């Protein structure tokens, strides 16, 4: 899978861009604030219909603009498809080969991407929201039904929270029952993904670290009895919700569910968050992204497009080398941003193209 053409109109500070990326490594360099990350954001949006910065539609449109347009030509197995996303303040519209997509499930999968940002390096030590965001992105790529399950859960959660905010108990049982069923679907899909990448994670971590340290990744439900969950999943969630009922009324929000769950990262049987060194934590996240890439490659029998946002400044020389060696072995397209070409060992990257970005313009 390759992105062979990209066109942007009024997307953030990228006014009129036409780009023909190389099929392997594409390096975009320039000072901060010139548009490098915006370029990666446009590719991510072309694949997922979302901004990885959680930006509103209006923020994606250039100043004084009415709309933004992102178009790309994707090639897979010698078949080309034209993808377009129109961004207006009131919403987005997507087309594939000029056909308007009325179901998002028909749109997704035409371009698969994996994103690696400095934010994710802090995923081990950071808050649970970072880990949930990573997990949702990773699960969704190979499990398109996850998006529907998650959106259903989010709608039910919103309605239940609305009752809690006004301390209205009438009807709360109905929403609680629906919440539990929707939550179980989300949890099931999240856990299934973690089961699939567990062995991959260990293999890549061993390759990076060069030692026999063991790593674990586990799903942790907030406030739920894990032993009861195995026997009676719905009963375990209902019990947890009952136990937190007073807290929910006091706070006016749902205290139990996938929106509060977390991931446990283990190293040699202990919490990586508490006991791993900074180097070990970075190796863990790097192995996690490698496992994600390998998983997607197996799902679609084609590697995803990789977006590396200023990662060369976040990884030390050895981990940079490990990442690049991993990428060189795979027939995948990579987009790299950096403030300086000195941060990227260009000579070691075969089939590379470099682009300078200045004030929203791309200079070859």
Curated annotation (Swiss-Prot):
Q: Give the molecular function GO annotations.
A: ATP binding; single-stranded DNA binding
InterPro entries referenced in this protein's UniProt entry, alphabetically: DNA-binding_RecF (IPR001238), P-loop_NTPase (IPR027417), RecF/RecN/SMC_N (IPR003395), RecF_2 (IPR042174)
Localization, UniProt: Cytoplasm
Q: Which Pfam families match?
A: SMC_N
Q: GO CC terms on record?
A: cytoplasm
Query: Where does the chain bind ATP?
Result: 30-37
Q: Name one GO biological process term.
A: DNA replication
For whether the record's keyword set contains DNA-binding, the answer is: yes
Main localisation: cytoplasm
Alphabetically list the UniProt keywords. ATP-binding, Cytoplasm, DNA damage, DNA repair, DNA replication, DNA-binding, Nucleotide-binding, SOS response
What protein family is recorded?
Belongs to the RecF family.
Q: Which PANTHER family match?
A: DNA REPLICATION AND REPAIR PROTEIN RECF
Describe its function: The RecF protein is involved in DNA metabolism; it is required for DNA replication and normal SOS inducibility. RecF binds preferentially to single-stranded, linear DNA. It also seems to bind ATP.
Q: What is this protein called?
A: DNA replication and repair protein RecF
Q: Which organism is it from?
A: Citrifermentans bemidjiense (strain ATCC BAA-1014 / DSM 16622 / JCM 12645 / Bem)
